[in-house]
Structure formats: structure tokens, C-alpha cells
Amino acid sequence: IMKFKKIAALLGAFTIASSLFIAGCGNTGSSQKTWRVGTDATYAPFGFKDKDSGKLAGFDVDIINAIAKEEGVEADVQNLNFDALLPALQSNTIDIAISDMTISEDRAKSVDFSKPYYIAGNGLVVNIDNTNINSFKDLEGKRIGVSIGSTGAEIASKIPNADVRQFNLIVDAFLELQNRGVDVVINDTPVNEYYVNSKGKGIAKVTGEDYDAAPLGIAVKKGNTELLNKVNDGLAKIKANGKYAEIYKKWFGKEPPAEDLK
């Protein structure tokens, strides 16, 4: 009886271990049923936590859910700080990152990007009573707030004599602006516009022309061609069947420009 119990216990342990191994393999194979997706939920309207439901919402969330549906899988969208997204891809903590992320040469060294799903420029946000900053040319020597690892941070690093202050969350940069701790925030224009018309209404304003517009992409781990192809396939399908335009209009209140539908 004792021998039988030992054998049964060993078989049980083996079964559990085998199940875990198979489940782990499923995260990268073609039989994968759920995509683990990371986004920074402080970049409204691209990603944010809905105050009523507590769930993640936004343009990026809807886009990746629509792509996943086309590919016959679920998208489990998780909230991560922006600067943690690429390390999470590299460590296999997540499969996909979508978070208002500009496709850049530097980022493309460590991850692979989908075809562009949005074209966005970077702009300036100042306090509503500010009259000294009207363009990027006025930023020399100014206190500039940016999000760590963002395109805004890269732009700010090139401004002469600027006091660049980096924040984990873009909402913290906006709060520091409100508290007069920085003179200006450099960030993606759609997020800036959403902020000054919501939480920053009557407090802050967008000023000046956009910095060069650049494409946003969906990132996967370097070399994960199978997943990248599925993301691109789903993206092409939602652009062709009208779902992309529907989501775009929902969050930006207008039809998408032709360049975003390519």
C-alpha cells in the first residue's frame, strides 16, 4: 500500500509538472489562445483606467482587442509603466506592447514593430497663463517635464541648457506642470489634447506647432516573427473592414486620415 501511495504521488507530481510545462509552451506556440498585452494606462485616450468599471480602456486597448478577435485569440491587457514595457517583452512577461509607442531606430534594436497603426506628433503643454513659450524654439533653459523612455524625453535631451525632469507617469509630469515645478511638458499631441480638454481644462493649454510626426507601432519580442505576422494580419483586416475607422472615430471624434489607413 505504501509503495502504491508513493507511486501515485509521483505520478500526480509528474502530471502537474507536465501540465505546467505544456501551458508554458502554449504562450509562444501557434496554439496560443491569449495574448498578454502591456500598456501604460496613463496615456488617455490611448490607454487609461475607466473610473466607473475600473477596467482598462482607450484607443490602444480597443485596437489590440479588435486585432486579437480577427486572429481568434483573446487579449489580456495589463497596466505597466511605459519604461517597463520593452523589458517585459524581452523577459517574456508579456507578448505584446501597445502604448502610444513611436517606432524608432533605437527601440527597433531590441523589439520588432508592426506596421504603423497611428501617426502622431509631439507637442507642448504649458499652464494656461503662460505667454513665454510658444514653440520649441522657446525651450532653451526651461524646465521640461517628460515621461521616462518617451519620444518627448529624446526630444528634450537635445534642447540646449534645458532642465529635463523625467517622470514614471505622464500624469505626474502634468501634475508637476500644474504645481509650477516645470515650465512645459513635451508629449504626444493626441494625449496632450485629451488632457487639456479633460483633467487639465482651464488649467493648461497646448501651444506651438507639433514636432515631426512619427508612426506608432505595436511591439513584440525581437525575432517573434509568427506573432508579428499575426498582429500585422489582424491590423490589415480591421483597416480594411471598417473596424479601425470605427474605433478611431470613437476616441478622436473624426474619421481617420488616409495615411493611418495604409
What residue spans do the PLM features occupy?
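Ligand-binding clefts/hinges and TM-proximal coupling segments of bilobed small-molecule sensing domains
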Residues: 27, 151-165, 203-210, 235-262
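Periplasmic-binding protein-like
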Residues: 41, 119-126, 193-232, 254-262
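Acidic, polar ligand-binding/catalytic clefts
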Residues: 61, 74-138, 204-205, 209-210
